Amino acid sequence: MLPVLQDAILQYEKKYSSKIDAIIIFDPTAPLRIKKDITSALDKFKKEKADLVVSVHPCQHNPYFSMLEKNGKYFKLSKQKSINPGSRQEVPVVYEINTLVWIYSRNAIIKEKKRIPKKTVIFKTPYSRSVDIDTKDDIEKINYYLKKNEKFKTAH
């Protein structure tokens, strides 16, 4: 993704003799975003002077507590702290990136060249708007949220 964005920015700047400050990405697989998600994320981007504002929601499966990865013959927790947590309440809160809004600075794309740059700030969104369409089940979830919340339809 970054090489495409780098090329697009540089081509635009060359063609129009105008420098781009930031680029906003709206993933087409995230149809439940509302106008407020965009304006609030943009406000946060400006206020925090971030290189990336990315929308997130609380992670349903915390890697400090309930996710395993292969470790040789056996498995271990994906992320570990010095404590041995006995409950989910004892581990750090973790957020999952969703694709409602990504706002990158020019610096992040052209100079830092990282998907998640050092100056990343999160924009929290509710899980009910964070559904990505990757499977048929996801389409059913979206239909459920749309039927459940009629006012959502008018928030666009």
Language model features with spans:
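Conserved core of the sugar-phosphate nucleotidyltransferase
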Residues: M1-D7, A22, P31-K119, K124
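Short, charged beta->alpha transition segments
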Residues: Q6-K15
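Short, well-ordered alpha-helices that flank and scaffold nucleotide-derived cofactor binding pockets
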Residues: L10, D43, Y144-K148
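Short acidic donor-binding loop at the edge of a beta-strand
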Residues: K15-I24
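Helix-loop-strand module that forms the ligand-binding subsite of alpha/beta enzymes
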Residues: P28
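Hydrophobic helical membrane-anchoring modules
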Residues: F123-K124, S128-H156
